[in-house]
């Protein structure tokens, strides 16, 4: 039993080492410029170990993007009270913006991720984190009749579009930082327009 636990720990450790190493390389050089050999070398594992964990580099990119969202989600979750729908929607956006501005140089650009893993995979991963939280809050506000009678899918797509816009423009860090207050004010105004008074 102890041997099995040790194997599981090694498996997880190797997996995480590959993801961490790949994420660093993808950020530094871009997805296309990084080889599996380079990732394996940085992770201090064999190429065989790479293929034991991942079918290909694309699958590893998905894992890296998921890890990126986990980090963003953890940051937001520790700073946001998710029980109050309206303030949670504001807070999630503000803290997301803060995280992107503060950690911009350590993020894989969404423009590199989406063409490789595809929109469906990107959306599936996103639904586990920020997108899922926003959707759950919108559903709750609809159930509580706090939102105007708009189609729930339209509302969810528009609200999540704000986050996608920030992700797409993350590389324009100076513009994001300089106009942060305007982004927040416009977003709040948009939220207010949705309230069923």
UniProtKB/Swiss-Prot annotation:
Native species: Escherichia coli
Gene Ontology MF annotations: DNA binding
This protein's name: Transposon Tn10 TetC protein
Keyword Membrane in record: no
NCBIfam families for this protein: Tn10_TetC (NF000040)
High-level lineage: Bacteria, Pseudomonadati, Pseudomonadota, Gammaproteobacteria, Enterobacterales
Domain HTH tetR-type span(s) in chain numbering: 12-72
Superkingdom per UniProt: Bacteria
Residues within the DNA-binding region(s): 35-54
Keyword entries, A-Z: DNA-binding, Transcription, Transcription regulation, Transposable element
Residue stretches spanning the membrane: none
Record carries keyword Amino-acid biosynthesis: no
